Amino acid sequence: GIHITDVSHHIAPDTALDQEAKERCTSVYLPENKINMFPHELANSLFSLRKDELRPALSVIIDTDNRYNMKNYEIKETFIKVKDRFTYDKVDELIGHDSDFNILYNISEKMREKRKAGGAKLFYTPELEITVDENKEITMKIYDRETPSHKLVSELMIAANDITASFCKANAIPIIYRSQPALDDSCVLSDTYDPVNFYQQRKYFKKSEAGIVPLYHYGLGVDCYTQMTSPIRRYNDLIIHRQIKSFLNKKPYFYTNRELEEIIMYSEQILDSVNMITRNRKRYWLLTYLKKMIGSSVDAIVLQNLSDRIIFILKDYFLELNCTNSTNYEKKYSPGDLITVRIETVIPREDIIKVSIIGESEE
């Protein structure tokens, strides 16, 4: 079973706490700070599934055959007591040695294969995680989402959202769905991290959309999709829980389709603003870090060679930059070439960074 903490058990609609969460819409994760949608004291204790403590949950129970294909499912209210908590690294160790984790991993791989057959665009882009402590010390770590444990959790969360959307569609439960238009057939993404391929293909990407009508999600390769797996940090997930519980308990729905459309209009604007702020803050702190490296040389990968400039990405920082081209560069460098650049100027508050190309990397 996939068990999601049931925040709606603790918070009634239109209470002061609910109104504040609705206004915030989402938790915000910045390098220097985290702004919770709910108070930290509640989000990390009463609302969370904690070890050895009984907590209400909304559970998606999946029944599979001996080949790990899903036969049927059930969505129900439960009370869960977590027996053990595992880090991603620990789960990576257990996969291949522990029969229960092997079964879970095999189920998740079968789900991944099914999505791929449904047209899912699976691609890998590592993420640079930037954290800033109280002394403004900047730490950077490359976050690998393609480990077996990360793929396992990701597939199970996608499955829970997919199944929930199908359940709501079949029972005409008014909820917020997410969909994504079909990508151009000429879009061919690499299964492994390839910055040149990603740069060339991203023009075909289309933004996911929220609505009250269940439509195909081409990016994930599923017939319909919603989000209900993070009610602590996404208000719209909390809405889905309330609607499903109303159906299960044969009670009137808390939200009409018209109210859901109003919530979508507001929340999409907030989420766009939050995403922009998050990107800008990450870039600011990355430039602040690189400012200490003025005069240093770093490796970069050429993405495109144009008549007036060369576009490249700093290899260890995933920062896309460009510099003025010259006759020598125009003939010399091709997409995928590894080059060395020198950091010349960095002004974080003005979002300025200037580099110069030294030559081909010796790596």
Each predicted region: which residue ranges?
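Electropositive polyanion-binding surfaces
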Residues: 1-363
